[in-house]
Amino acid sequence: MASPSKGNDLFSPDEEGPAVVAGPGPGPGGAEGAAEERRVKVSSLPFSVEALMSDKKPPKEASPLPAESASAGATLRPLLLSGHGAREAHSPGPLVKPFETASVKSENSEDGAAWMQEPGRYSPPPRHMSPTTCTLRKHKTNRKPRTPFTTSQLLALERKFRQKQYLSIAERAEFSSSLNLTETQVKIWFQNRRAKAKRLQEAELEKLKMAAKPMLPSSFSLPFPISSPLQAASIYGASYPFHRPVLPIPPVGLYATPVGYGMYHLS
C-alpha cells in the first residue's frame, strides 16, 4: 500500500493538469490514493481558495513560439533595413522634394506674414466717403455777365412780348431807349423768351395727348366704325359699279375680359 508520503513525493502542488498515480488497484490503499489525488488537484488549481489566499502564481512553461517569433523578427529586421537602405539609394528624389516644398511653404508663409504686417504696401488705397462734387459746366472766360433786370423792366418786357413776339429794328430801338437798355439786351431777352414759350407750348401739347389717349391699346382697331357701319359700307359700296348688296351689320359692343377684349351683340 502506498503511503501518503510517497503520494506527496509523486505529485507536486506546482504541476498543472491531472496527475496519474501509480498504485495498486481498488482497495483501501486505492481509495486513499484517489483522495490524495483529489487533494493535490484541488491544491494545484490556480483558481482554488488556497491559491487565491496564498497569492501563488503557477509557473508558466516557456512556450517555444515567442522564441521562434523573436528569431524570425531578428532575421527579418536586417532584411527590412537593407531594403529601406536600397530604396533610399535608388530614389533620392522623393526625400529631397519634401524639404524643397517645406522651404517653399515657409518662404510663402513669410511673404504672407510680411504682406499682413505691411498693409499699406499691397492693399488698395482706402476709399474716401466724401460726397462727390457736381462738376458744373464751365463758361467761356470772355462771356458777358447777366443783365440784372429790374422788376419794372421785366413787367414791361413781358407786356411787350404778349403784344408782339418779334420786334422790328425801329421798335426795338425805341423800346430799349424807353427802358434804359441796349438793343442787344432787348434782342437777347426776346430770343430767350420765345424759346421758353416754345418749350411751354410743347409741354401743353404733350399733356393734351396723354389726356386724349384712348384706353384701348394702339394695336387694337376695328375695320369699320362702330357708330355707323351701314353708312360706311354703303359709301364704300357705291363707288364700285358691281358691288354686292350690303348685309345689315348688327351693332356690337366691346367688353373687357381678363384675357383680352371681346365683342357681343347689342339687343
UniProtKB/Swiss-Prot annotation:
Entries under InterPro entries matching the protein: HD, HD_metazoa, Homeobox_CS, Homeodomain-like_sf, Msh_Homeobox_Regulators
CC annotations in GO: chromatin; cytosol; nuclear speck; nucleus; transcription regulator complex
Consequence of changing residue 147 to A: Does not bind DNA but still suppresses OCFRE activation
Record localization: Nucleus
SMART domains linked to this entry: HOX
DNA-binding region: 142-201
Composition bias type Basic residues, residue spans: 136-146
GO molecular function terms listed in the Swiss-Prot or TrEMBL record: DNA-binding transcription factor activity, RNA polymerase II-specific; DNA-binding transcription repressor activity, RNA polymerase II-specific; RNA polymerase II cis-regulatory region sequence-specific DNA binding; RNA polymerase II transcription regulatory region sequence-specific DNA binding; sequence-specific DNA binding; sequence-specific double-stranded DNA binding; transcription cis-regulatory region binding
Low complexity: bias regions: 62-71
Chain spans, region Disordered: 1-71, 116-147
Pfam family, one: Homeodomain
Function per UniProt: Acts as a transcriptional regulator in bone development. Represses the ALPL promoter activity and antagonizes the stimulatory effect of DLX5 on ALPL expression during osteoblast differentiation. Probable morphogenetic role. May play a role in limb-pattern formation. In osteoblasts, suppresses transcription driven by the osteocalcin FGF response element (OCFRE). Binds to the homeodomain-response element of the ALPL promoter.
Self-association and partners: Interacts with MINT. Interacts with XRCC6 (Ku70) and XRCC5 (Ku80).
Pathology linked to this chain's protein: Parietal foramina 1: Autosomal dominant disease characterized by oval defects of the parietal bones caused by deficient ossification around the parietal notch, which is normally obliterated during the fifth fetal month. Parietal foramina with cleidocranial dysplasia: Combines skull defects in the form of enlarged parietal foramina and deficient ossification of the clavicles.
Name by which UniProt lists this protein: Homeobox protein MSX-2
Origin species: Homo sapiens
Name of the coding gene: MSX2
